[in-house]
Amino acid sequence: MPRLDDHLWRGPCAKGTKHRSHPRASARGLVAKAGEMINSSGSGPSLLAAHGALGTDPAHGPQSAGVGGQGSSSHVNSWHHHLVQRSLVLFSVGVVLALVLNLLQVQRNVTLFPDEVIATIFSSAWWVPPCCGTAAAVVGLLYPCIDSHLGEPHKFKREWASVMRCVAVFVGINHASAKLDFANNVQLSLTLAALSLGLWWTFDRSRSGLGLGITIAFLATLITQLLVYNGVYQYTSPDFLYIRSWLPCIFFSGGVTVGNIGRQLAMGVPEKPHSD
């Protein structure tokens, strides 16, 4: 038979031991939690480093590079597309101006084509419009390119109405060269030179435009002299090395006019991408 006093004695002792062991367990839990906090604080930088390594993982690098490459490729394609469009427009403008102005010169008997030339492949001077169209495309693309290279974007009268007025003045200068009669060619040349400089001052006023206009006038005059010297065609009453002395003025004003057209076409066109 169990003894009652033993049961009563063991009961409080057991409860006491339980109450004494519970604070020990709680103390151990606090120590464990403190250790976990220390471990977590120590492993934080390593986790950040791991995330950083993941962000710079070479596997992700090609993906971002591929996206950038696609954007650059589309930008290049867009730039080339605009370049082709501008070239075609400038070529067409050069062909039309050549047809109109050459017809005007021929009607006024300023330009004469010998019979032996007309009887050959140069019949009706079919080569003049394509050559003028090609020259117009080159000049029209060169003007905005020089502006971009010099870091001086042309902002003077950048609207199509001004460009069309410039074209009208250029045609008027060419018409005056064929129709006006002066006492001598020097007066005519000085008058056309003043009109050409007035065209540049009215519609351009840029140093690059003036320099390119003078360069174009010199090169075009030299090429024309070579063609006339080889008998491809000739001018009536030549007064300056087989040609007319006012011809450089026509080339100068034509370069300024085509340059303004090229600048206007270049507005809103994305810049050429630069490869590092």
Swiss-Prot record:
Top-level taxon of the source organism: Eukaryota
Coiled-coil region: none
One GO molecular-function entry: oxysterol binding
UniProt short sequence motif KxHxx, positions renumbered to this chain: 270-276
Membrane-spanning segments: 84-106, 126-143, 159-181, 185-203, 209-230, 245-262
Keywords: Cholesterol metabolism, Endoplasmic reticulum, Isopeptide bond, Lipid metabolism, Lipid-binding, Membrane, Phosphoprotein, Steroid metabolism, Sterol metabolism, Transmembrane, Transmembrane helix, Ubl conjugation
Any Pfam family hit: INSIG
Membrane topology: Multi-pass membrane protein
Extracellular side: 107-125, 182-184, 231-244
Family: Belongs to the INSIG family.
Free-text comment about domains: The KxHxx motif mediates association with the coatomer complex.
Name of the protein in question: Insulin-induced gene 1 protein
